[in-house]
Amino acid sequence: RSCSESERAQAMQICQRPFLVVRAPGSGSEGTGDLLLLRGDICFPIEVKSSKKKKLYLSGRTVLQYQALEEIGRRCSLQPFYAYRLKGVRGDSWRIFRVKIEGLTGKSRLLARRVPELPLTRNGTPYLDWDKGLPLHKFLAFIAKSESAKNIESNMAAKKVYSEILEPLINQYDSSSPDRAASSLSNS
């Protein structure tokens, strides 16, 4: 609600290529993440966290969750993500981070290049730093893009050009040319 018009427009691009979003049974259990996003070209789990502090350190159960997501990502060739909400922020309060997974292919690999990894503490433990994450509206705009979406957009643009510009010109030419009208009558 408090996002700018630009942020809202970028986020709404996802409506062109939506996902089926499933709340994982036993959310918070190891390896599943809280949400599973599914679409024909890509699938990924998301672990959701929120805090009033910009930095959220993982420890105990949350480190085990991270390690389980890492293991599932490796075994299943999936790219898990964290969605981190900073409470009390106006505008886009969500930031996206990825769990580091090696050997991804296809769209998962492209997506992994765009999203920052969870930073590490001095002792190597991952944590969430809101300032270092990718804003949710940018993440949504990126995953909404695809070749088929671009093709749909270009086909729609071509139809619009034809219907708004070319078709009226053709109709105008057909109706204003006496030779055209006479030849079309003699052909019938």
Please state what every model-predicted region is:
Residues E70-L104:
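Nucleic-acid nuclease catalytic cores
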Residues D92-L185:
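Intrinsically disordered, low-complexity terminal regions enriched in charged/polar residues
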Residues P25, V48-K49, A83-L86:
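Short His-Asn-centered micro-motif
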Residues L35-L37, D41-K52:
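Conserved catalytic cores of phosphodiester-cleaving nucleases, focusing on short active-site segments
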Residues S51-R75:
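Mg2+/Mn2+-dependent nuclease catalytic core
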Residues R1-G26:
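Acidic-basic catalytic patches of nuclease active cores, encompassing PD-(D/E)XK
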Residues G26-S27, L36-L38, R74:
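Short, conserved, surface-exposed binding loops centered on an aromatic residue
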Residues G31:
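Beta-rich catalytic cores
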